[in-house]
Regions:
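Periplasmic-binding protein-like
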Residues: 148, 207-211
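ALDH superfamily catalytic-core signature
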Residues: 207, 215-288
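N-terminal Rossmann-like NAD(P)+-binding subdomain of aldehyde/semialdehyde dehydrogenases
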Residues: 1-118
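Residue-level signal for inorganic ion chemistry
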Residues: 11, 47, 92, 154, ...
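Short beta->alpha connector loops at strand-helix junctions that form conserved
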Residues: 155, 160-162, 190, 211-212, ...
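A structured beta-alpha segment of the ubiquitous adenosine-cofactor-binding alpha/beta core
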Residues: 119-120, 187-206
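Conserved small-residue-rich beta-alpha loop and adjacent elements
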Residues: 106-183, 228, 250
Length: 288
């Protein structure tokens, strides 16, 4: 079977990708684990070199990546640049520079006299193979940030992007290819989210990141409980904006309109409620 990526603004086909044969998931997992062992043996500095190659690719092809996101997802080119492409480049930069500080071994003082002659150290070990099921509303920046975090922590990654935006998944593949990673360390999977999630759990995924709806999140958490698989679920938000009496109302109203309607309102951090101090309420509403 094939999955067709449709431009929501024009109805034109953007790309057509073959669905991944999930019968091959055991073999995919084996390749990921073999690559992960090789990758985990690298230092943070060595991993960062690969991430830097990805950052350069993103910067050099920023316009092309923004166009792919815009055509696949429907958001404007400027939104695609600002909320998708730029965050990916920034993520590469920050995690490459800081992962060693955050995840490196940390010494701890003895908490009891009995352990005064002991040395205590906290070590953050890789999980192994991390699965990611990402949403359509931010099809590049959300999964890519999770990918970079997982890689810098020494993990392999299996990615399943939203069924509505497979062209962006292919673009992510190209970014990862630019990183010159070990074969099998990153794999892009095309198909149904529920079927892929089941295949992940059945084949021993070590952690799952999911961004999507509350009902889907509940289903995944119930599945994960059967194997005690750790999950990280981001299931939307109900975000408030607060406007105080001393606020610049022109700036506040512009910000409120953008935050509420950017990406057609399909944003987990979009403004859905506004609390305005009584003294400026009428003026704020009129401006808005």
């Amino acid at each position: 079977m094939t999955v067709t990526d449709i431009n929501p603004a024009t109805g034109a086909a953007v790309a057509e990708l073959n669905e991944t044969d999930l019968a091959g998931m055991p073999e995919r997992m084996q390749r990921a684990r073999a690559a992960q062992r090789q990758w985990a043996a690298k230092s943070f500095k060595e991993r960062a070199r690969h991430i830097e190659l990805m950052r350069r690719y993103i910067v050099d092809r920023a316009e092309d990546l923004a166009a792919t996101v815009s055509d696949s997802n429907g958001k404007t080119r400027i939104d695609a640049l600002a909320t998708e492409v730029l965050p990916c480049a920034l993520a590469c930069n920050w995690y490459a520079k800081n992962a060693g500080k955050v995840l490196g071994p940390q010494k701890r003082a003895a908490g009891h006299l009995l352990f005064a002659n002991k040395r205590t150290e906290v070590s953050h070990l890789p999980l192994g193979v991390v699965g990611i099921i990402s949403p359509w509303n931010y099809p590049l920046s959300i999964p890519f940030g999770e990918i970079v975090m997982a890689l810098m922590a020494g993990n392999a990654v299996l990615l399943k992007v939203a069924a509505a935006t497979p062209a962006v998944g292919r673009a992510i593949e190209r970014i990862l290819d630019a990183g010159e990673l070990p074969e099998g360390l990153f794999q892009h999977i095309v198909g149904s989210g529920s079927k892929v999630a089941t295949a992940f759990f059945e084949n021993g995924i070590d952690k799952l990141f999911f961004t999507g709806s509350v009902p889907a999140g509940k289903t995944l958490m119930a599945q994960a409980a059967q194997t005690l698989t750790p999950v990280s679920l981001e299931l939307g938000g109900n975000d408030a904006m607060i406007v105080l009496a001393d606020a610049d109302l022109e700036r506040a109203t512009n910000g409120a309109a953008w935050a509420g309607y950017q990406n057609a309102g399909q944003s987990c951090g979009g403004v859905e409620r506004i609390y305005v101090e009584a003294a400026v309420y009428d003026d704020f509403v009129e401006r808005l």
